[in-house]
Structures are given as C-alpha cells and as structure tokens.
C-alpha cells in the first residue's frame, strides 16, 4: 500500500464560502451523512464514526444552501501536519462536486493556518490531480 500527502506550500487553492468549522457537531447528522455516503459508494466494509475522533479533531462542514450535506474530520498531527481522517457526503446533489471542493478548501484552510503537510492516507490515482500531491516513499 502506498500513502500520499499534499505539500501545502505547492498549492494555491481558495477557501469555499459554503464551508465552516463545526463547533459541537451534531453526531446524529454526521452519522446520517456518513451512512448515505457509504451506501452511495457501496463500501463492503466500513468503520463507524468514533466520538473520540470527532471531539479531538476539526470537523469541517460543507453546506448546500443552509443544509449540512458533507463533512471532513481532520486531526492535527504536529505543528506542520494534519491528517484527513474521514470525508463523507450525502450525494443528494452530485453536481456540487464536494469531494474536490473539500480537498481544495482544506488545503487553503490549513495552509493559511501555517501547516505544511496534509496527509490523505492511502494513495489513489485521482489524488494525483491535487496540486502538491506526493506519494510517500520508504523510511
């Protein structure tokens, strides 16, 4: 398995006006979106959302009008690195392309906060379309 990250110094994305940090996120709403996402993607195996991860991470909400339709859970690893733990979207309006918009917004957000790296977990070819994306090598 290969892993990837984004070097935020090599990005120039803009913040999304329809995104914001969720303070005290509604777990029920997040679980509904997560369930919709997993069903839409037809994942054969999923982990549940854990309150601990949510309470100790940033939760960024993405809105369509005033409706929460997607979220990302991002953990702070150290002074220069964050990791995307989970993204989920209900796909009620696929034309929003929230997967891409979330990636771009999060790059802009964490770069503005002074972070250098955004770790994305396992490598998938579509991630190569994100500016600054790099596949990690061996230690």
Range-by-range predicted roles:
Residues 1-22:
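Acyl-donor-binding surface of acyltransferase catalytic domains
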Residues 3, 13, 34-40, 52, ...:
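Sequence-level detector for tyrosine residue identity
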Residues 18-95:
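A conserved beta-strand-loop-helix scaffold within acyl/acetyltransferase catalytic domains
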Residues 70-71, 76-135:
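Acyl-donor binding region in acyl/amide transferases
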Residues 138:
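Patatin-like phospholipase
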């Amino acid at each position: 398995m290969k892993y990837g990250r984004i070097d935020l110094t090599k990005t120039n994305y803009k913040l999304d006006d329809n995104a914001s940090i969720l303070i005290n996120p509604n777990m029920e709403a997040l679980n509904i979106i997560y369930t919709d996402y997993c069903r839409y993607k037809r994942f054969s195996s999923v982990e549940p959302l854990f309150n601990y991860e949510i309470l100790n991470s940033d939760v960024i909400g993405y809105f369509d009008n005033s409706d929460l339709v997607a979220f990302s859970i991002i953990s702070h690893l150290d002074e220069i690195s964050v990791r995307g733990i989970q993204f989920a979207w209900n796909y009620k309006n696929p034309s929003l392309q929230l997967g891409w918009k979330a990636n771009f917004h999060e790059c802009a957000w964490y770069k503005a906060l002074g972070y250098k790296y955004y770790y994305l977990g396992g490598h998938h070819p579509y991630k190569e379309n994100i500016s600054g994306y790099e596949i990690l090598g061996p230690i």
